[in-house]
Amino acid sequence: FLSYNFHDMSDLYHSWLILQQLSKFKNSSPIICEVGGGYGGLASKIKSNIKGAKIIMLDLPEVNAFQTFYLSKVFNGAIVKGYKDLSEEGLDVLEDKYDFLILPGWAIDKLPKASVDAFINVRSMMEMSKENLEFYFKAIQSSLKIEGTFSCFNRYIKPVGNFENRLDLYPFDDDWQILMSQASVFQPHIHQFILQRKANNSGSNFRQKLRDVGKKFIRSLK
Protein backbone atom coordinates (compact mmCIF):
# COMPACT_ATOMS: atom_id res chain seq x y z
CA PHE A 1 0.00 0.00 0.00
CA LEU A 2 1.10 3.56 -0.71
CA SER A 3 1.76 5.39 2.54
CA TYR A 4 2.07 9.17 2.79
CA ASN A 5 1.62 12.02 5.24
CA PHE A 6 -1.54 13.94 4.29
CA HIS A 7 -0.44 17.10 6.07
CA ASP A 8 2.90 17.11 4.27
CA MET A 9 1.14 16.51 0.96
CA SER A 10 -1.12 19.49 1.73
CA ASP A 11 1.96 21.62 2.37
CA LEU A 12 3.39 20.55 -0.99
CA TYR A 13 0.14 21.45 -2.74
CA HIS A 14 -0.15 24.81 -1.00
CA SER A 15 3.50 25.69 -1.62
CA TRP A 16 3.07 24.85 -5.31
CA LEU A 17 0.15 27.28 -5.58
CA ILE A 18 1.90 30.02 -3.63
CA LEU A 19 5.27 29.70 -5.35
CA GLN A 20 3.68 30.32 -8.74
CA GLN A 21 2.95 33.87 -7.54
CA LEU A 22 6.37 34.31 -5.89
CA SER A 23 8.50 33.23 -8.85
CA LYS A 24 9.81 36.78 -9.35
CA PHE A 25 11.64 36.43 -6.01
CA LYS A 26 13.54 33.29 -7.03
CA ASN A 27 16.91 35.06 -6.98
CA SER A 28 16.23 37.79 -4.43
CA SER A 29 15.64 38.14 -0.69
CA PRO A 30 11.96 38.91 -0.08
CA ILE A 31 10.44 39.16 3.38
CA ILE A 32 7.75 36.49 3.56
CA CYS A 33 5.56 36.35 6.65
CA GLU A 34 3.47 33.33 7.63
CA VAL A 35 0.76 33.69 10.26
CA GLY A 36 -0.11 30.47 12.09
CA GLY A 37 2.34 28.23 10.26
CA GLY A 38 2.31 25.32 12.70
CA TYR A 39 5.63 23.51 13.02
CA GLY A 40 6.96 25.11 9.81
CA GLY A 41 6.27 22.55 7.10
CA LEU A 42 4.96 25.02 4.52
CA ALA A 43 7.61 27.61 5.36
CA SER A 44 10.35 25.03 4.82
CA LYS A 45 9.08 24.31 1.31
CA ILE A 46 8.90 28.02 0.45
CA LYS A 47 12.44 28.52 1.78
CA SER A 48 13.77 25.53 -0.18
CA ASN A 49 12.56 27.15 -3.40
CA ILE A 50 13.42 30.78 -2.60
CA LYS A 51 16.73 30.31 -0.83
CA GLY A 52 17.33 34.00 -0.18
CA ALA A 53 13.95 34.53 1.47
CA LYS A 54 13.80 36.03 4.95
CA ILE A 55 10.85 34.26 6.54
CA ILE A 56 9.01 35.65 9.55
CA MET A 57 6.90 33.13 11.47
CA LEU A 58 4.10 34.46 13.70
CA ASP A 59 2.39 32.03 16.05
CA LEU A 60 1.72 31.11 19.67
CA PRO A 61 4.90 31.15 21.81
CA GLU A 62 4.68 27.41 22.46
CA VAL A 63 4.43 26.78 18.72
CA ASN A 64 7.41 29.09 18.16
CA ALA A 65 9.49 26.55 20.11
CA PHE A 66 8.54 23.74 17.70
CA GLN A 67 9.19 26.01 14.70
CA THR A 68 12.66 26.89 15.97
CA PHE A 69 13.53 23.21 16.50
CA TYR A 70 12.11 21.94 13.21
CA LEU A 71 13.46 24.66 10.93
CA SER A 72 16.90 24.51 12.57
CA LYS A 73 17.00 20.77 11.86
CA VAL A 74 15.79 21.04 8.26
CA PHE A 75 18.15 23.91 7.44
CA ASN A 76 21.38 23.02 9.18
CA GLY A 77 23.37 26.19 9.75
CA ALA A 78 20.44 28.51 9.09
CA ILE A 79 20.34 31.81 10.96
CA VAL A 80 17.25 31.59 13.17
CA LYS A 81 16.35 34.65 15.24
CA GLY A 82 13.53 35.18 17.69
CA TYR A 83 11.65 37.53 19.99
CA LYS A 84 14.75 38.15 22.13
CA ASP A 85 16.51 39.58 19.08
CA LEU A 86 13.52 41.82 18.31
CA SER A 87 13.44 43.00 21.94
CA GLU A 88 17.15 43.81 21.97
CA GLU A 89 17.54 45.27 18.47
CA GLY A 90 14.10 46.66 17.78
CA LEU A 91 13.10 46.91 14.13
CA ASP A 92 16.76 46.90 13.10
CA VAL A 93 16.54 43.11 13.35
CA LEU A 94 14.51 43.12 10.12
CA GLU A 95 17.56 44.46 8.28
CA ASP A 96 19.86 41.78 9.73
CA LYS A 97 20.96 38.71 7.85
CA TYR A 98 18.67 35.85 8.85
CA ASP A 99 16.79 32.92 7.36
CA PHE A 100 13.95 32.76 9.88
CA LEU A 101 12.66 35.27 12.42
CA ILE A 102 10.32 33.45 14.78
CA LEU A 103 7.96 35.67 16.76
CA PRO A 104 4.77 35.49 18.86
CA GLY A 105 1.70 36.50 16.91
CA TRP A 106 1.17 39.78 18.74
CA ALA A 107 4.47 41.07 17.32
CA ILE A 108 2.84 41.49 13.89
CA ASP A 109 1.81 45.03 14.78
CA LYS A 110 5.50 45.96 15.11
CA LEU A 111 6.10 45.37 11.39
CA PRO A 112 6.77 48.69 9.62
CA LYS A 113 4.41 50.02 6.99
CA ALA A 114 4.99 48.49 3.53
CA SER A 115 7.83 46.24 4.72
CA VAL A 116 6.59 42.73 3.81
CA ASP A 117 6.59 41.21 0.31
CA ALA A 118 4.16 38.36 0.97
CA PHE A 119 1.84 37.14 3.72
CA ILE A 120 0.60 33.56 4.04
CA ASN A 121 -2.19 32.15 6.19
CA VAL A 122 -3.36 28.59 5.73
CA ARG A 123 -6.26 27.31 7.84
CA SER A 124 -5.68 29.33 10.98
CA MET A 125 -7.63 32.55 10.46
CA MET A 126 -10.69 30.32 10.38
CA GLU A 127 -9.95 29.55 14.06
CA MET A 128 -9.80 33.22 15.12
CA SER A 129 -12.24 35.38 17.02
CA LYS A 130 -13.62 38.56 15.47
CA GLU A 131 -11.20 40.65 17.55
CA ASN A 132 -8.17 38.62 16.47
CA LEU A 133 -9.17 38.82 12.81
CA GLU A 134 -9.43 42.60 13.06
CA PHE A 135 -6.02 42.79 14.78
CA TYR A 136 -4.24 40.70 12.14
CA PHE A 137 -5.93 42.32 9.15
CA LYS A 138 -5.09 45.81 10.37
CA ALA A 139 -1.41 44.81 10.56
CA ILE A 140 -1.37 42.92 7.25
CA GLN A 141 -3.05 45.71 5.30
CA SER A 142 -0.55 48.20 6.71
CA SER A 143 2.71 46.25 6.49
CA LEU A 144 2.26 44.53 3.11
CA LYS A 145 3.93 46.33 0.21
CA ILE A 146 1.86 47.58 -2.71
CA GLU A 147 1.86 44.72 -5.28
CA GLY A 148 2.72 42.30 -2.46
CA THR A 149 0.66 39.11 -2.14
CA PHE A 150 -1.53 37.56 0.54
CA SER A 151 -2.25 33.83 0.29
CA CYS A 152 -5.34 33.21 2.43
CA PHE A 153 -6.61 29.60 2.48
CA ASN A 154 -9.45 29.19 4.98
CA ARG A 155 -12.89 27.69 5.53
CA TYR A 156 -15.92 29.44 4.14
CA ILE A 157 -17.70 29.14 7.50
CA LYS A 158 -16.57 27.83 10.89
CA PRO A 159 -18.09 28.38 14.35
CA VAL A 160 -15.57 29.74 16.86
CA GLY A 161 -17.37 29.70 20.20
CA ASN A 162 -20.40 31.96 19.74
CA PHE A 163 -18.79 33.69 16.75
CA GLU A 164 -19.53 32.54 13.20
CA ASN A 165 -16.18 32.89 11.45
CA ARG A 166 -17.05 33.58 7.80
CA LEU A 167 -14.52 34.13 5.05
CA ASP A 168 -16.83 36.53 3.22
CA LEU A 169 -16.95 38.75 6.32
CA TYR A 170 -13.20 38.93 6.93
CA PRO A 171 -12.20 42.60 7.48
CA PHE A 172 -10.51 43.09 4.11
CA ASP A 173 -10.55 46.59 2.70
CA ASP A 174 -11.34 47.12 -0.99
CA ASP A 175 -7.76 47.45 -2.23
CA TRP A 176 -7.01 43.91 -3.36
CA GLN A 177 -6.77 42.28 -6.77
CA ILE A 178 -7.60 38.58 -7.10
CA LEU A 179 -4.77 36.50 -8.58
CA MET A 180 -6.37 33.16 -7.68
CA SER A 181 -9.76 32.25 -6.23
CA GLN A 182 -10.89 28.62 -6.00
CA ALA A 183 -12.17 25.90 -3.71
CA SER A 184 -9.46 23.53 -2.53
CA VAL A 185 -9.15 20.39 -4.62
CA PHE A 186 -8.69 18.23 -1.51
CA GLN A 187 -10.93 20.12 0.94
CA PRO A 188 -13.79 21.85 -0.92
CA HIS A 189 -14.96 23.56 2.30
CA ILE A 190 -11.71 25.58 2.13
CA HIS A 191 -11.43 28.56 -0.22
CA GLN A 192 -8.03 29.51 -1.60
CA PHE A 193 -7.37 33.18 -2.28
CA ILE A 194 -4.11 34.59 -3.55
CA LEU A 195 -4.49 38.36 -3.57
CA GLN A 196 -2.31 41.28 -4.61
CA ARG A 197 -2.21 44.47 -2.58
CA LYS A 198 -3.26 47.62 -4.40
CA ALA A 199 -2.87 51.31 -3.59
CA ASN A 200 -5.44 53.09 -1.44
CA ASN A 201 -8.70 53.87 -3.27
CA SER A 202 -7.65 51.63 -6.16
CA GLY A 203 -11.23 51.01 -7.26
CA SER A 204 -10.73 47.23 -7.03
CA ASN A 205 -14.09 46.76 -5.26
CA PHE A 206 -12.75 43.60 -3.63
CA ARG A 207 -15.27 43.43 -0.80
CA GLN A 208 -18.14 42.92 -3.24
CA LYS A 209 -16.21 40.11 -4.93
CA LEU A 210 -15.60 38.58 -1.50
CA ARG A 211 -19.33 38.68 -0.71
CA ASP A 212 -20.06 37.01 -4.05
CA VAL A 213 -17.76 34.12 -3.09
CA GLY A 214 -19.73 33.70 0.13
CA LYS A 215 -23.09 33.78 -1.67
CA LYS A 216 -21.93 31.15 -4.15
CA PHE A 217 -20.89 28.83 -1.31
CA ILE A 218 -24.20 29.32 0.53
CA ARG A 219 -26.12 28.45 -2.67
CA SER A 220 -24.06 25.27 -3.04
CA LEU A 221 -25.35 24.06 0.34
CA LYS A 222 -29.01 24.21 -0.72
Please provide the spans of the model-predicted regions.
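Conserved Class I S-adenosyl-L-methionine-dependent methyltransferase catalytic core
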Residues: 1-27
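Membrane-proximal basic amphipathic "stem/tether" segments
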Residues: 197-222
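Conserved SAM-binding loop of SAM-dependent methyltransferases across substrates and taxa
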Residues: 40-50
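A conserved beta-strand element that flanks and buttresses the S-adenosyl-L-methionine
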Residues: 120
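S-adenosyl-L-methionine
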Residues: 71-112
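A short glycine-rich, Lys/Arg-flanked "PGG" loop and its adjoining helix->strand segment in the class I
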Residues: 134-146
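Conserved beta-strand signature within the Rossmann-like core of class I S-adenosyl-L-methionine
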Residues: 146-156
